[in-house]
């Protein structure tokens, strides 16, 4: 595993715990600040950083829409709100940054079925862990809730990684791109 992949993993974990534990302990601003710092460092290491920023912004919007829908339909609950709060939105670009070139999950844009499987398993696991740590509440039927989240993430994760391949790295898989890379 490369140093960039290890740093990608560390950024993912640090951002996730800052968002979830910050929200659970009454510091909902903490996670977005940590994620913003981590993403700033991430973007600084990417070729085509303007495209990366654009893509991370798209991912944040997608995350806001998805989580707001889950909240509005009662799949998830966060007391006092029916729209996705900033700490929950921040988790989306934090996760998707690991699919960038050199990142922990950089092979996902070339493997949409693996991306779907990761979404189907990892999404529910993350939401369940967030609920166990007190940041969110799951709907009244835990297994149904996790199944819904799994289906949503099984669709959204491969869609986002395929979008990454189109928006950020349209030539990432050609030999000319690899030769031009430092």
Where are these regions (language model features)?
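Aromatic-rich, lipid-facing transmembrane alpha helices and their immediate juxtamembrane interface loops
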Residues: 1-182
């Amino acid at each position: 595993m490369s140093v960039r992949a290890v740093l990608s993993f560390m950024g993912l974990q640090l951002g996730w715990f800052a968002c979830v534990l910050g929200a659970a302990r009454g510091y909902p601003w903490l996670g977005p600040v940590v994620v913003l710092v981590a993403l700033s460092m991430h973007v600084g290491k990417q070729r085509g950083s303007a495209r990366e920023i654009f893509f991370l912004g798209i991912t944040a919007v997608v995350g806001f829409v998805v989580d707001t829908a889950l909240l509005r339909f009662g799949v998830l609950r966060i007391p006092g709100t029916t729209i996705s709060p900033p700490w929950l939105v921040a988790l989306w670009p934090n996760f998707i940054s690991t699919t960038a070139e050199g990142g922990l999950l950089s092979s996902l844009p070339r493997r949409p079925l693996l991306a779907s499987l990761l979404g189907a398993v990892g999404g529910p696991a993350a939401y369940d862990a967030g609920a166990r740590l007190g940041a969110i509440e799951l709907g009244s039927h835990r297994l149904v809730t996790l199944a819904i989240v799994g289906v949503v993430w099984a669709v959204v994760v491969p869609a986002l990684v395929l979008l990454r391949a189109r928006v950020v790295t349209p030539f990432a898989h050609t030999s000319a791109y690899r030769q031009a890379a430092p």
